[in-house]
Amino acid sequence: MFCIACGLNISEIPFAPVPGNHETYNLNWKVRLPEAYLKYFAVPDNGSANFGRYYYSYDYGDVHFIVLNSQWDETEEFKPGLRDEQVAWLRQDAAASRKKWKIVLIHKDVLQYRIHNRPERQEGISEVGEAFMPLFDELGIDLVFTAHLHTYRNRGHIKNFRRDSKGPLYILTGVAGNVRYPGLWIDHELDEVVAPQPETDNYLTMQVTNKEITVKCFLPDGQEIDKMTLTKA
């Protein structure tokens, strides 16, 4: 279904997939290894003997893109060690890049939200955030795009798990498709911009120059709801 729906665009526009939880489900919603993802997406090799192409990086212009895999809870029973292997690889990969900008894409989000009308849980940092946010600080990552929660949130810059202009910019990319959770997430103290409620689809654009990255968020009708600019001399 995905290939049919996106086939024309993928054939004409470069496509960089980010593996998520649905890549580790079969048609009966049973957890498995990401077999279809690995079959259909010829992403760059990462040099791993155990997790080849589960995560990867590539360069486009003066940007080094790092695509991480947040699905270690799903893969652990079949093939343990995905999180720890990525932590070691990320240090080496990011440190080796000489590109001006470093951008991370990862499916599961770095923050944990309280939820309306669900069992209470504490607002804070997610397991993914605990694993990677200190590394993003250490390695000078400029921008982090996340997903999974089907909502658009701009968190601004975060460092040491707190708002800090010296940290990476964190963007939860939003909604695409017909799965929406109106009124589910209770706003996090680190949210700076939230999409108009109840949410509809949205899309993002990104423009990179020698000195700036500009990210904009739009609703399907073209209304701009957010704009962020990163600068670097």
Describe the function of each predicted region.
Residues 190-233:
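A short C-terminal boundary segment appended to hydrolase-like catalytic domains
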Residues 20, 93-94, 105-108, 135-149:
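Conserved beta-strand->loop/alpha-helix structural units within folded catalytic cores of enzymes
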Residues 70, 150, 218:
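Acidic carboxylate-rich catalytic motifs and surrounding loops in phosphoryl-/glycosyl-chemistry enzymes
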Residues 1-98, 118-132, 143, 154-198, ...:
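Extended active-site neighborhood of metal-dependent phosphoesterases/phosphodiesterases
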Residues 97-115:
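Short acidic, glycine-rich surface-loop motifs adjacent to enzyme active sites
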Residues 112, 116-123, 170, 220-233:
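A short, hydrophobic/aromatic-rich structural module that often spans a beta strand
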Residues 146, 154, 227-229:
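Residue-level detector of high-confidence beta-strand sites
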